[in-house]
A protein has these predicted regions:
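A short, charge-rich alpha-helical start-of-domain segment used by transcription regulators
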Residues: 2-8
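Short alpha-helical patches at coil-to-helix transitions and adjacent helical residues
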Residues: 9-13, 64
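Divalent metal-dependent catalytic cores for phosphoryl transfer on phosphate-bearing substrates
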Residues: 25-137
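A hydrophobic, small-residue-rich beta->alpha segment in the mid-to-C-terminal subdomain
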Residues: 138-145
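Charged phosphate-binding loop/patch that engages nucleotide di/tri-phosphates or the phosphate backbone
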Residues: 146-162
Length: 162
């Protein structure tokens, strides 16, 4: 799981930093983006996801808030927010309730520009095909399975970041 986590996180960090460097007008905190991108999936080891060598007891959808808890204990509250808010295009309180997700009842959508950038960059990489950057079309197809709101958010990020 460690090698998968680090490889995936490096891909996300590199994509996010490349976007940040291409958009100096956004004044993105690149040091924070690098750190938070490297830590955004720290909670995966607590989940039951054998395909990525994780044998914990929680459903995979919980990895964001579980990672957030780890980083809060380490006194990294801003990094913790990235963990909690990066899944998909973020998860709203309404989605948590409607889909009966096993998550704390609070909004988990990215707010800061840095949170949004890491969430966006994360969409381009899976943990099962580490070397492959996903196409925009593939990402749209994956997001459509969850909600049309996710696709709309993704398109807004494409306009902002690409």
């Amino acid at each position: 799981a460690y090698d998968i986590l680090v490889n995936h996180s490096e891909s996300v960090a590199n994509k996010a930093l490349s976007i940040a460097h291409n958009h100096p007008e956004l004044k993105i905190d690149t040091e924070f983006v690098f750190q938070a991108a490297m830590l955004h999936d720290i909670g995966i080891h607590l989940t039951n996801a054998p395909s990525i060598a994780c044998y914990g007891s929680y459903p995979y959808v919980c990895h964001g808030y579980l990672g957030s808890g780890i980083l809060m204990e380490e006194q990294l509250p801003q990094h913790a927010l990235v963990c909690e808010r990066h899944t998909g295009t973020g998860i709203s309180l309404e989605e948590i309730v409607t889909r009966k997700l096993p998550l704390p009842l609070r909004d988990m959508k990215p707010i800061s520009l840095e949170e949004q950038l890491i969430c966006f960059a994360d969409l381009f990489f899976s943990k099962t095909h580490l070397e492959e950057e996903l196409s925009i079309t593939t990402i749209e197809t994956k997001l459509q399975k969850f909600s049309s709101h996710s696709v709309v958010q993704f398109h807004q990020w494409c306009d902002l970041f690409l």
